Amino acid sequence: MPAAIASAAIAPVLTEPRIRAEQVTQLVLGETATITDLSGEWRRVCTHTDGYDGWTHAGYLCEASEQQVDQWRERATAWSEGASINIGQLRQPLPLRARVELQADTVLLPDGRRGRVISGSVRTLEQLTLAARAKAPERWALEYFAGSPYEWGGVTPWGVDCSGLVQTTFAVRGVGLPRDSAQQVFHGSAISFEATQPGDLLFFCGESTSNITHVAFAGEADTLIHSTLACGGTLVEPWLPGTRAGTLRHRLVAVRRLEDR
């Protein structure tokens, strides 16, 4: 089957092949997918990162054979930490999670363009994982995402939802998770609420449904670290009874631990 590499900084993945459709996730520059269907200039894709299905426009992609995509994935072993590069006279930002190929002191993009890092950093995934694991996951999430706006379907600090925050945080730690909180809850070890530690994942059902609709990191001293539309983005907030986030307590469904502390 044909495949593709995201060549735009962010490629929105939508529920339908039309620009006003709901965004359900994103392909970040350098991430890959299999093309499963066509509709004019739209491509239905199954993302290689997490198997998510949706539609994105061909303009966001470099289409290629499966062999070419596999070769790219073997070479693109470096990740952006929010770097910017110079391409000729142009400055191009690379969002956190963008995957590129490092060649000496230059960065190679999926479409063949080359640039030099002028701010931020680009590191191999191995280096990034070692650095990330030196910090607690919830602290890393705050360091890179605090103040990021809430965006349904987003996975980067340019805009992120609750499960995107969790997925990206653990991706840089070398732990692959599904895209949605309803699937993330099946990963890790079940923990009682009384045994909750900072860094554990807290899963909540909706106000009018038993389905899981929200995930947050447990923080220190009865706090949550999460991306929430109610506060406009990613933050740390108390969730003791009587606080705004305290209303979530009766909706807690599960606590899961992905890493021992």
Describe the predicted segments one by one.
Residues 149-198:
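Catalytic cysteine-centered active-site loop
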Residues 1-14, 68-83, 168-183:
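Short, basic/aromatic beta-hairpin or loop at an interaction surface
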Residues 43-46, 214-218:
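Short beta-strand-centered aromatic/proline hotspots
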Residues 63, 125, 189, 219-261:
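Aromatic- and glycine-rich peptidoglycan recognition patches
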Residues 149, 155, 205-214, 228-233:
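Active-site loop architecture of trypsin-fold serine endopeptidases
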Residues 23, 89-90, 189-192:
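Short, conserved secondary-structure segments in the cores of folded domains
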Residues 1-2, 18, 25, 31-32, ...:
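Boundary regions of SH3-family modules and the immediately adjacent low-complexity/disordered segments
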